[in-house]
């Protein structure tokens, strides 16, 4: 299975160069973490990144669609930004605060996910990451409106500690926890998961 490459919002010719290099790999989709525009470390290294407005996203999206590629935008934290991504023609968004490392005091993704999912439901795929560690976490994110859930750091830890088998074991545990949580919340199919299973005090 091939992965989905994510690139930074590089400036000018470097962006096209990066896009062309990943297009050549023929991945299932190509992503861009637009919140990386806040990575001061890249500028200090002489690798400037730039904010992406609707016009810039539309241009990138059109270019990738011409090449037969789907485009995912990562770093969405508000309904208005999600709607901008939809109007630009993006195929999917990732609700993500970059692990809280870009802007201090950002809300968690679980807090903002429901309103974002409601804003673009039926127009694009909504993915989410952020502090997802167990199968129960996966269930909660789906119940809050995500179409699918991304897990990053724990997979890296599993790979470093146990290689391919470590990753398989980790996802095996996630699946077992997820199925048990579905059973205990009375959900028979993933498509039946809804906010009704959540306790919100």
Residue ranges of predicted features:
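Active-site entrance/lid segments in N-terminal catalytic domains of soluble metabolic enzymes
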Residues: 1-83, 87-88, 99-102
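Glycine-rich beta-to-alpha transition loops that act as phosphate-gripper elements at the mouths
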Residues: 9, 72-79, 106, 125-138
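Short beta->alpha connector loops at strand-helix junctions that form conserved
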Residues: 6-9, 96-97, 130, 152-153
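Catalytic pocket-lining loop regions of alpha/beta-barrel enzymes
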Residues: 87, 94-96, 106-110
């Amino acid at each position: 299975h091939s992965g989905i490459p994510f690139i930074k919002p590089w400036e000018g010719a470097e962006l096209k160069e990066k896009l062309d290099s990943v297009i050549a790999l023929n991945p299932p989709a190509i992503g861009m973490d637009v919140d990386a525009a806040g990575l001061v470390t890249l500028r200090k290294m002489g690798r400037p990144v730039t904010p992406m407005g609707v016009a810039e996203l539309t241009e990138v999206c059109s270019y990738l669609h011409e090449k037969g590629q789907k485009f995912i935008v990562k770093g969405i934290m508000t309904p208005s930004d999600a709607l901008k991504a939809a109007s630009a023609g993006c195929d999917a968004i990732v609700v993500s605060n970059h692990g809280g490392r870009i802007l201090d005091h950002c809300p968690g993704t679980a807090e903002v996910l429901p309103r974002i999912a409601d804003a673009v439901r039926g127009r694009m795929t909504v993915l989410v990451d952020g502090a997802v560690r167990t199968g129960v976490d996966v269930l909660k994110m789906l119940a809050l409106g995500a179409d699918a859930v991304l897990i990053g750091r724990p997979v890296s830890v599993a790979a470093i500690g146990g290689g391919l088998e470590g990753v398989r074991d980790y996802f095996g545990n996630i699946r077992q926890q997820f199925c048990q949580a579905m059973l205990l919340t009375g959900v028979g199919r993933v498509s039946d998961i809804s906010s009704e299973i959540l306790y919100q005090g």
